């Protein structure tokens, strides 16, 4: 059987909502909304660029990545290769929105760094996320905390994928508002069903007592 490589983009789905991850990567459901369509257009624009070299830095676009160790694979938007010795590899990811408190985008960047380290036999100490909406570039240290968080997510997401299990909706209802899978997921109906069965179980317990 072929080894399954988890798409790096799936880690962001998992970090946002494990159910969203499972709907896309276990059940193969996908529904595009304004946010996903806009994000796709942005990546197509970034992907168009040819490699170029300026002031000791080579800029490589749409670089394919793979880690045999962590069983992840994907494509990164931009890799800066600083050509002085020792060479420095600096991943850059483009996002349509603005910087976030949560690590969703940083996890994706860290997974890219893990692949580069394995493929190039190097250590990646930092990368950057460029936010289209705010025209801001956030430098991200690839530190021990981010690495641990990213590796935890890789392992848990991989297990869910292997088990074919779809978790319940996130407790954080605000995330559902911008979720491209809201119509397919029907989180409110699922939550109501869960509340109904919970109440039934509660009264069943009282009858027994
Ligand atoms: S609608 Fe909410 S619970 Fe469902 S996948 Fe999206 S974020 Fe998760």
Which residue ranges define each predicted feature?
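Metal-dependent nuclease catalytic cores that hydrolyze phosphodiester bonds in DNA/RNA
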Residues: 1-91, 95, 199-209
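Mg2+/Mn2+-dependent nuclease catalytic core
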Residues: 55-156
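A diffuse structural propensity rather than consistent per-protein peaks
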Residues: 4-7, 102, 143, 164
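Metal-dependent nuclease catalytic regions and adjoining charged, substrate-binding loops involved
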Residues: 68-69, 118-209
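Short amphipathic alpha-helical surface micro-motifs
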Residues: 3-6, 41-46, 61, 110-111, ...
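Non-catalytic, well-ordered alpha-helical scaffold segments
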Residues: 8-9, 76, 106-110, 173-177
């Amino acid at each position: 059987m072929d080894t399954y490589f988890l798409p790096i983009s799936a880690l962001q789905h998992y970090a946002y909502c494990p159910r969203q991850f499972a709907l896309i990567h276990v059940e193969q459901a996908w529904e595009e909304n304004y946010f996903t369509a806009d994000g796709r257009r942005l990546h197509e624009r970034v992907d168009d660029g040819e490699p170029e070299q300026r002031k000791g830095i080579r800029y490589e676009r749409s670089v394919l990545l793979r880690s045999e160790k962590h069983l992840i694979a994907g494509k990164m938007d931009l890799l800066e290769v600083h050509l002085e010795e020792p060479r420095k590899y600096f991943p850059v990811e483009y996002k349509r929105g603005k910087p976030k408190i949560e690590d969703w985008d940083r996890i994706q960047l860290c997974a890219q760094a893990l692949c580069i380290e394995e493929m190039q036999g190097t250590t990646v100490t930092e990368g950057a996320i460029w936010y289209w909406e705010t025209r801001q570039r956030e430098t991200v240290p690839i530190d021990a905390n981010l690495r641990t968080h990213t590796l935890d997510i890789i392992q848990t997401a991989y297990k869910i994928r292997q088990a074919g299990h779809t978790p319940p909706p996130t407790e954080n209802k605000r995330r559902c508002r911008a979720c491209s899978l809201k119509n397919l997921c029907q989180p409110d109906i699922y939550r109501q069903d869960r509340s109904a069965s919970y109440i039934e179980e509660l009264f069943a317990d009282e009858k027994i007592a």
